[in-house]
Amino acid sequence: MINKPNQFLNHLDGLKQHFSDYDSLQKSFKKYLSENQTELNNFFFNQFEKIIVLVKKKEFKTAQERCEEELATPYFSKPLVGFFQSLLQLINHDLIEQKNQQLANMSCEKIVEMVLSDYPNKLNLIHYLLAKEASFVNPNLLQRMTFVLTDLELLELKRFSFFKALNQIPAFKNHKVTYFNSKLKQKFVITLGEFAFPQTDKTKQFFQQLIKKVSQLFLKEPVSCEFAYEIIDALLVSFFPLHPNLEVNHLAKKIHQYVSKIVINEVVDLKDPTTKLIVDTLYEQLDRAIGEEN
C-alpha cells in the first residue's frame, strides 16, 4: 500500500490559494509564469488555458474531468497544484449552477428518476430537494430510494452523504430507514429528521473531544490541521453512527504523527494498528474530492 499519498499533499497546497473568478486566477497564473519560466510550467499553463476554453463554452463537466486529470499528475509542483485546485473549485461551482438550472422546472418524481438513473453516479442530485418546500416532495418516493442505504457495494462516503440529504428533507421527517455500515458490518434503524445529526451522546462527545485535542496539537500549523480535520471527517463517515473504539488522546496523537510525516513526505509505520486504521480509512474514500462530495 502507498503511504506517501500525493493526493493528500496536493490538497494541503491547494488550501493556500483562493480565487473568486476565472480572470483573477488566470492573471495570477500568468504572473507566476512570467517569474518562473520553465518548459514544464509552460506546458501546464497551456493545459490550464485549454480548460479555460472549455469553461467559456460552458462545457463544465469536460473541464472538470480535464482538471482532475491534471491534478492526478504526481510531479505537479506546489504552485501549480494551487492554481489547478482553485480552477477545479470554480468549475465545480459552475457545474452545480448549470445542473440547478436544468432541474428548476422538473417535478419531484423526475428529479428522483434522475437521482437513480446511471446508479450510483448521480446520487448527489438528491441535494437539490433540500431547498424545496415539504409540499413539493412526495413522501412515498422515499421507499424507492432507501435501498441506497443498504447497498453493500456502495462506497461508504456516498451512502453517508445520501443519508445526510434524506435526513434534511422535511417531507421524510419521522420516517424510519435502515442504514448499513460496511466497516462495522452492522445495520442501524434511524428515524429521519429526529436529530440534525443522529449519533449517541457518547459518540458526539468522542468526536468533539477529538477535534479539540487535534486543534491543540496543531495550534501553530493551520494548514496541517485542515488535513487532520479531513481525517476526522473520514473516521466519522466510516464509523457512522458510532465511533472508533480507541482512546481519544491516543487517536489524536496518532493523527498528529501521521499528518506530520505526510507533510514532509516521510514513510509512515503501517505496522502500527492505529496508523493503519487512519490510512485504510482515507484510502476507502479516495474517490472523494477532498473537502467536497461530488
Curated annotation (Swiss-Prot):
Record's signal peptide: none
Cite the Pfam families for this sequence.
DUF3196
Protein name, UniProt field: Uncharacterized protein MG237
Q: Which SUPFAM superfamilies match?
A: Hypothetical protein MPN330 (SSF116965)
What species is this protein from?
A: Mycoplasma genitalium (strain ATCC 33530 / DSM 19775 / NCTC 10195 / G37)
Which residues fall in a coiled-coil region? none
InterPro entries, alphabetically?
DUF3196, Uncharacterised_MG237_central, Uncharacterised_MG237_N
What superkingdom does the record give? Answer: Bacteria
